[in-house]
Amino acid sequence: MKTLFCIGELLIDWISTDIDSSLVDSVNFIKKAGGAPGNAAISCNRLGGKSAFAGKVGNDAFGMFLKETLVKEDIDTENLIFSEHPTTFAYVSIKKDGERDFIFMRGADELLEFHEIKLPQENAVFHFGSATGFLGGDLSETYFKALDYALEKKFFISFDPNFREALWPNPEKFIEFSKDFISKSDLIKLSEEEALLISGKKDLQEAIATFKLKKNAIVCVTLGKNGTLLYFQEKLEIVPSISVEAIDTTGAGDAFIGAVLKQICDKTPENFDEVKNYVSFANKVAAIS
């Protein structure tokens, strides 16, 4: 089994407990561990995988809480670095349909430097799923250097852009950076919104056709309750999900990618049916997460 190596932000999600309330109107919040890369690592480990996380948190009570969370999930925290800057926060409210309202307050996550990371030498799958990895600062430089390292080592590379409109009022740079990562990744997981935004198209099939892809790259476009649009080996098919009531979609995409990557860590798929089975299982994991 390969180790899933996740790099990016680990943060505190302050989640509104006021039902169907915007952040403007929310009063009550609970604290939860958050950050897409960490969520993906947790998803992988809960399914029996082996994950490691690389990122930076504050040397404060919140950073300690985040480390304890990863340790409880048996995730390798050798590359969880503590900073004198405060831990990053995200404030989240949940609407009636399960969709989210976000505000980010960046902190230590953007200060991760490449030289601080002890990189795996073999048997690794690299996952780039950071929502803040393209925003500048040391993390952005580290993100791109880690991609180059993974390419040099010929590791399997996974990319999830995790677009947040609140972070990108002007998304041109996000689109440029995402296209670069898409062209160099073996697995690309996108939401429908992300696929259309990055491609500049209005149709998902056209969007996928515009991407510059590696040979045998897997593209998964998640469609919520409608399943996942899967592209692999020039074949395109919607893989259905199971029907559940949407209460909170926070982390569902991370649960999905973690489930796909756990299976890839066990065995790199060789044909469409094998990938389809991976995605079908991941759809179910995401639906009940």
Task: Identify the meaning behind each predicted range.
Residues 131-209, 227:
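Conserved beta-alpha-beta core of the PfkB/ribokinase-like small-molecule kinase fold
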Residues 42, 89-93, 227-231:
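Short beta-strand scaffold segments in enzyme catalytic cores
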Residues 10, 161, 255:
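Active-site metal-binding loops of divalent metal-dependent hydrolases
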Residues 1-75:
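Glycine-rich phosphate/adenosyl-contacting loop at the front of the ribokinase-like
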Residues 44, 191, 253:
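Short, conserved phosphate/pyrophosphate- and ester-handling motifs at nucleotide-, phospho-/glycolipid
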Residues 50-130:
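Conserved N-terminal subdomain of the carbohydrate kinase-like
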Residues 1-5, 148, 200-289:
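Conserved phosphate-binding/catalytic region of the ribokinase-like
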Residues 51, 77, 157-158, 219:
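Hydrophobic beta-strand scaffold residues
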